Design a protein with these regions (language model features):
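Short His-centered aromatic/hydrophobic patch
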Residues: 87-94, 112-115
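Conserved acidic donor-binding segment of nucleotide-sugar-dependent glycosyltransferases
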Residues: 299-300, 304-311, 318-326
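Glycosyltransferase donor-sugar binding loop
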Residues: 38-41, 189, 216-229, 245
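Conserved small/polar residues in nucleotide/adenosyl-binding loops
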Residues: 333-342
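Short hydrophobic beta-strand element within catalytic cores of glycosyltransferases
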Residues: 284-287
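Conserved donor-binding/catalytic core segment of Leloir-type glycosyltransferases
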Residues: 178-196, 202-205, 219
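Donor nucleotide-sugar binding/catalytic pocket of nucleotide-sugar-dependent glycosyltransferases
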Residues: 136-172
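Nucleotide-activated donor-binding/catalytic signature segment of Leloir-type glycosyltransferases, i.e.
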Residues: 230-250
């Protein structure tokens, strides 16, 4: 009997999740895995060296011509020669329907990164996600609380829970961001969207007593479509610096090793990519107490939790962190060991 053949599809948005997992499975699973990376025409996400083939789209996601591109893709890779299709790609238009048609009776395992709708989701995205859950039958969930939610809402579906792995971006190879090592350095990292509550974090920093503000610094690093709004909110506060841009992958290790805490003030999340990067680089977090964080953060051991959307509580936690005699009193050296225990 030959090896099982797996077609593994990863979109740019989930490349940071799969880039450490798929090469490991290729080496140790005993299965033949062909890995396909799907990229937008203007993507800056690098191609992983273990990827079998990269497919760059010429049209935007809602353009009906995307249907023809999906047809071309599935014909080119011979989708029906596989035993299992693992889909780590998400659009809000045609992908699932074309994949379902071409796959026929082949198992499609959908990587369900988000199950419970975020407050910032559009109606189209809500409809599309619900459609995938309704018509597909096999799913992977990445956090315990979303797995429990999924089991209750979709009791007839087949699912398995495999926690999101810690994420490595290699060794430090850049020196582009200057930090004052005499201060407590805080990092907000990733695309800035409404549910991540950067506004709350900025208010918290500005609300600290001046003598504490003088001893801390927040760097905000990531793409932002509404940068001017946050620059106005910061209003010249010298304890906050902004880098509103796409952070190159080669710079990520530098950022996560130069700071003392990763800030995760989100109001809702299933799981967080930056959170898993932080744990790889032994960087503790200050996070809201939503379930997506509470199942991984042990308060005072690998980070601190504060009450969701509570400015007063966030200020208090930042004050607590600023008063540590030795930042390493939060057990950095055990962060990856703690994550390993969850897997």
């Amino acid at each position: 009997m030959g090896k099982k053949k797996i077609c593994w599809i990863t979109g740019d948005a989930f490349m940071d999740t799969d880039q450490n997992v798929v090469p490991y499975l290729m080496k140790y699973s005993g299965m033949q895995i062909d890995w396909y990376q799907l990229s937008d025409f203007n993507s800056k996400v690098p191609v992983h060296p273990d990827v079998t083939c990269v497919f760059k789209f010429k049209n935007r996601g809602l353009n009906p011509l995307r249907i023809l591109e999906y047809i071309k893709l599935f014909n080119a890779i011979g989708i029906r020669k596989y035993d299992i299709i693992y889909s780590g790609f998400m659009d809000v238009s045609y992908f699932f329907f074309v994949l379902k048609f071409f796959a026929g009776k082949i198992f499609i395992v959908h990587a369900a990164h988000n199950v419970i709708p975020y407050s910032v989701w559009s109606k189209r995205l809500r409809w599309y996600v619900n459609t995938v859950f309704k018509y597909n039958h096999h799913f992977q969930l990445f956090s315990k609380f979303t797995a429990d939610y999924f089991r209750k809402k979709y009791p007839t579906k087949s699912m398995f829970y495999a926690p999101m792995a810690v994420k490595s971006f290699g060794e430090v190879v850049t020196d582009n961001y200057k930090v004052d090592s005499s201060k407590l350095n805080l990092l907000f990292f990733g695309n800035v969207v409404e549910n991540k509550r950067l506004d709350l974090l900025i208010d918290a920093i500005k609300g600290l007593p001046q003598e504490i503000q003088n001893r801390i610094h927040l760097n905000i690093c990531g793409n932002c479509k509404d940068a001017e709004r946050f620059i106005r909110q910061i209003d010249g506060c010298s304890s906050i610096s902004t880098y509103f841009k796409r952070i190159d992958d080669c710079e990520i290790a530098e950022l996560f090793t130069k700071h003392d805490f990763l800030m995760l003030p989100y109001e809702d999340v299933a799981q967080s990519g930056p959170h898993m990067i932080a744990y790889y680089y032994n960087l503790p977090v200050i996070a809201s107490d939503i379930e997506g964080f509470a199942e991984r953060v042990i308060d005072g051991e690998n980070g601190y939790l504060f009450k969701r959307n509570n400015l007063h509580d966030l200020v208090a936690v930042i004050k607590k962190a600023s008063q540590l005699d030795n930042v390493e009193s939060v057990s950095y050296t055990h962060l990856r060991a703690h994550e390993t225990s969850l897997h």
